[in-house]
C-alpha cells in the first residue's frame, strides 16, 4: 500500500525489471468507483501510472481492467474507449487508437469484454445522450469500464466524480506480480480500506488460479 508516499517512490521499486515485480503485461492503475448518479460500478483506467499510453500500452491497460472486472463479478464488462468525439478522425489520435482497439477485440487479441469507441463521455454513460446522437452501440450508456485517452484526463475525471458528484472509489495497480494499493495522499481512511478490500479480492483470485498472473 502506498500510504503517504509519493507515487514515484512506491512505483520506483516496482517498475524496474531488476526488481522482479514485472510480468509480460504493462503495469496500470484502475479506479473502482461508486458514483451515486450511475446505476453500476464504474472502473476508470489509467489515471495514475501511464502518462500518454500508445496503442499496445492501451491494449494491456484494457486487459488488466477486464481481468479486474471479472474478479468484481462483472462477467462480460462493457468497455468504453473515451475521446472527445465519437467519430474517427486523423486529427485526434485517441479516436484512431480506439478504433484499432475495437478491431483487436474483433480479432481476439483482447478478450473477456465488449469494446466500443471512440465514445465521448456523455455517450459512454448516458443512454439518452447516445440515442440523441443516434449511436447504436452495445456499450453506450452502460459502460462498466472507461478507458481514458491519457493520465491527465483520467485523473481529472476520477477526482471530479469524487469531489463534485459524491463518488467513492478505490485504487489498485495491476500488471505486476502482486496487486498494489495506490491511492492519493489526500484520500480518506474509507477509500484506503476500500482499496485494500479490492486488493484482497484480486489476491484471492490469484491464489485460486482465477486471475491471470502472466
Mark where each language-model region is:
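Anion-binding alpha/beta catalytic cores of soluble intermediary-metabolism enzymes, centered on
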Residues: 1-139, 143-214
